[in-house]
Regions:
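Catalytic, metal-anchored helix/loop core of enzyme active sites in primary metabolism
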Residues: 1-380
């Protein structure tokens, strides 16, 4: 029986991971970690019986201890708690699905402890790929992508040598505002931006998809996962979200992974790699589908994608600024403190003001994040 721990168990990826566990019946969940949703976390604890649970919020952790005092489970808190879950001795795979740079330290410690990583926390590689990937190689652990696009690329690379890649074709749905111009986005409200046409996701990533910043983060993530230069990653808008990504090889052949927009497929693939398992759910019906569309992304309207390429080309600490500025700006937009188009304005302002650090340490990455947050707060 495979033994796993999940960081971010109450979020979109975490809950779908537990659905995969439930459907298969041969995975033991030893550890869970969540932010503050202790009502759902209690349900998960009672069903999956983990030995160790981390809650980021200390007050909520105290409440949870009372709720589950009839169970044999240890409750821990904060960053130390996340790390304790991540390095549990019996755990074979750590699935990290927390949102933001909070996932970096637990991922580093899990790799040092020899755990394979099922990675749904793209910010870890965006900001610290130069630390994570060499460490994973040194420790002999696998980084298994859970993002649908990176899983598709990973699957399309099976049986082929990495040095034969001509380019990666990273697909995007285009989000809810595909085809719009900047002037059409002046009065976008939170509710408008949360209406993704194809995927059911968390609030932050749904906003990121609407601005195409999410795709920019995925471009940078792909460079670290697959060892390619940023300009070898080409974004292609594929509105139906049927082709999840493609790899073009030196001989001109293109291999793609297709499927319905269901995150359980890449989650299950990562948990059972290299084996495949039956997965219940809808299947593609090519007779009914009719056609697939492809478009070039509009980087003038969705300027955040252009900024991501700039951050990826520059490297160093600039991707951290890009990511941190976006995190805070999206939070402000969701709280109705700023307008939609200000998200990208804030990202660009922070990038232009930053003095780049070429090869930042983990501490410097976290300092850069804090400095970026402070700059945005000072705008008010």
């Amino acid at each position: 029986m495979k033994k796993i721990a999940i960081l971010g168990s109450t979020g979109s990826i975490g809950t779908q991971t537990l659905e995969v566990v439930r459907e298969n019946g041969d995975i033991e969940v030893l550890g869970l970690a969540a932010g503050s949703n202790i009502s759902l976390l209690e349900e998960q604890i009672r069903e999956f019986q983990p030995k160790l649970v981390a809650v980021w919020d200390e007050k909520k952790a105290a409440e949870l201890k009372i709720k589950v005092q009839d169970l044999d489970v240890k409750i821990v808190t904060g960053m130390d708690g996340l790390i304790e879950v991540s390095v549990m001795e019996e755990v074979e795979i750590l699935l990290t699905a927390v949102v933001g740079m909070i996932g970096i330290r637990p991922t580093v410690e899990a790799i040092k402890a020899g755990k394979d990583i099922a990675l749904a926390n793209k910010e870890t590689l965006v900001t610290a790929g130069h630390i994570i990937m060499p460490l994973a190689k040194e420790m002999g652990v696998s980084i298994l992508p859970v993002d649908s696009e990176h899983s598709a690329i990973f699957q399309s690379l099976q049986g082929n040598k990495m040095n034969s890649i001509h380019k990666i074709l990273l697909t995007a749905s285009g989000g809810p505002f595909r085809g719009k111009k900047q002037e059409d986005l002046l009065n976008i409200q939170v509710e408008d931006a949360l209406k993704h046409p194809n995927w059911a996701m968390g609030r932050k990533i749904t906003i990121d998809s609407s601005t195409m910043v999410n795709k920019g983060l995925e471009v940078i993530e792909a460079t670290w996962l697959f060892g390619v230069e940023v300009d070898k990653v080409q974004v292609v808008v594929q509105p139906q979200s049927v082709i999840h990504s493609m790899v073009e090889y030196e001989d001109g052949a293109i291999i793609a992974q297709l499927g319905t927009p269901d995150m359980k497929l890449p989650i299950q693939y990562a948990l059972y790699y290299p084996k495949r398992r039956y997965l219940p759910g809808d299947r593609l019906d090519f007779w009914r589908m009719g056609k697939l569309d492809f478009e070039k992304p509009d980087m003038d309207t969705f300027y955040g994608l252009a900024l991501a390429y700039e951050a990826g080309r520059t490297g160093g600490s600039l991707p951290t600024v890009f990511n941190a500025a976006n995190e805070m700006a999206v939070g402000q937009f969701l709280n109705r403190e700023i307008k939609y188009l200000e998200i990208i304005e804030i990202i660009e302002d922070c990038m232009r003001a930053h003095k780049n650090i070429e090869n930042p340490t983990l501490d410097q990455i976290l300092e850069t994040e804090a400095e970026t947050y402070a700059r945005i707060k000072s705008r008010r």
